[in-house]
Regions:
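Common nucleic-acid-contacting/processivity interface regions adjacent to the catalytic cores
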Residues: 1-42, 246, 256
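Helical catalytic core of nucleic-acid polymerases
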Residues: 20-146
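Short basic/aromatic active-site micro-motif
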Residues: 92-95, 99, 149-158, 179-182
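C-terminal polymerase-core module
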Residues: 105-115, 143-147, 192-248
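Short amphipathic alpha-helix segments
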Residues: 154-171
């Protein structure tokens, strides 16, 4: 990625693809989106702001139920979306427990009463979506089809919300995002939180700037011991090639020998089966 970036005068146009032409947009041929978090943070720190949808998938779940399936119970889902921090602390769970609950349809291996109640509400939504949409999506999972379908629906809506945000910012500021981050965007400007919140309010999505907190600390370059040329790779290679060479076809290694009697250089082949 960095080589391409340098070769293109420190600018890299990135194309995106979608699995089955729906849902999230993934970079083609590399991009900042694919990098490990610490490396990504180190490269974009002080250059781009990482705008992130707060609590994206749970918020979209609540939006779906409130707007399309109003008869489904969603008390626990609403609790989590509206008071995430306290729900996590009070019930001794973390956000990964929530995301797992959303994405699986089998019974949770947990005895946490709050989490089990949350998952029951999710299961109700999974069941009804599966019956309505199972012929509309490609579902590759045989062991978790309902959870897989819900995830696809969430990613489709997530991408629609991302498009909405991109379009709104472009219309107002005439700028495109520097990169797409699934449920977020990179921009060089830092004053657009209110704009993002206003254009995605209908979906119950708020935005925040994610801090680049996992940077790689680069210290001083280590002082390496001086290596004599004859002991370096190039020196050893040069010395080796004065005596040996390899014929690829037929594969034979030749060694140069010296005749003490007449002083003439002669060749000997060996290692016929290397």
């Amino acid at each position: 990625i960095l080589k391409k970036y340098i070769q293109n005068n420190y600018s890299l146009n990135v194309n995106y693809r979608q699995n089955d032409n729906v849902g999230r947009r993934f970079t083609l041929d590399g991009g900042i989106q694919n990098l490990q978090n610490r490396l990504k943070s180190s490269l974009v720190d002080n250059i781009c702001y990482d705008y992130d949808m707060v609590n994206a998938h749970p918020s979209i779940v609540l939006y779906i139920i409130k707007n399309y399936f109003k008869n489904l119970p969603c008390n626990y889902i609403a609790q989590y979306v509206n008071d995430r921090k306290n729900v996590l602390v009070n019930n001794n769970i973390d956000k990964f427990d929530i995301l797992k609950s959303i994405n699986v349809s089998h019974k949770l291996k947990s005895d946490n009463p709050w989490l089990l109640s949350f998952h029951q509400e999710i299961t109700n939504l999974q069941n009804i979506l599966y019956e309505k949409l199972k012929d509309k999506f490609v579902i590759n999972s045989k062991t978790n089809p309902k959870g897989s379908l819900l995830n696809k629906v969430l990613c489709v809506l997530e991408n629609h919300i991302l498009h909405t945000a991109e379009s709104h910012i472009y219309e107002k500021y005439n700028i495109y995002p520097d990169s797409l981050m699934f449920d977020g965007l990179h921009y060089k400007i830092n004053n657009i939180i209110d704009d993002l919140n206003s254009c995605t309010k209908i979906y119950g999505i708020n935005w925040d700037i994610k801090k680049h907190s996992l940077k790689i600390e680069i210290g001083e370059s280590p002082i390496l011991p001086q290596i004599k040329y004859e002991d370096s790779y190039l020196g050893v290679k040069e010395k080796f090639e004065k005596t040996y060479f390899l014929l690829l076809s037929p594969k034979v290694l030749f060694c140069r020998l010296y005749n003490d009697n007449d002083g003439l250089k002669k060749m000997m082949s060996y290692y016929q089966n290397i």
